[in-house]
Amino acid sequence: MFKNIGLAVALVAAIPSSAQLAPGVHMPPEIGLAYGRLGTAMMAHDAEGVRTVWADDFVVNSPNNTVLSREDVIAVMERDFLDYRNFRKHITFVGEKPEMTVVMGYDTMIPVKGPGAGKQVMRPFTDIWARRSAGWQLVARQATIAETR
């Protein structure tokens, strides 16, 4: 169980009020709005809200090299393990293609519960967004905990 909790902790994509773009980086408005909806849904533990942003086939490669599905992560969220203080998203790269956008950067946060609770965590990430019939959806994420202080 703690393995999945640690994996899910590495997944949270954004809390919009604390996102920072590196100089010269442009975020497509639709994806910026989707990050905002995702952050709001994650903070509220709103599974249906998360499902509107994460594609049905969403997968994440977590820090311990385990691949989790959308529903795996939502199950951990619903058990109340995805709470953070001082969450910041630093976006360093956005690569746009007609049907796909890659967003890279790193998150910093202090987990309230679970692995790393009470310590500052730095987590590089890569998010893959795809244009689907429902709009832009997050289809894949890689997140690695690089540093804990």
Language-model segments: what does each one mean?
Residues 14-16:
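N-terminal signal peptide c-region/cleavage motif recognized by signal peptidases
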Residues 1-7:
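Bacterial N-terminal signal peptides that target proteins for export
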Residues 20-52, 59-149:
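A beta-strand edge to alpha-helix "cap/lid" segment located at domain peripheries
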Residues 7-8, 19:
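Intrinsically disordered and other compositionally biased segments
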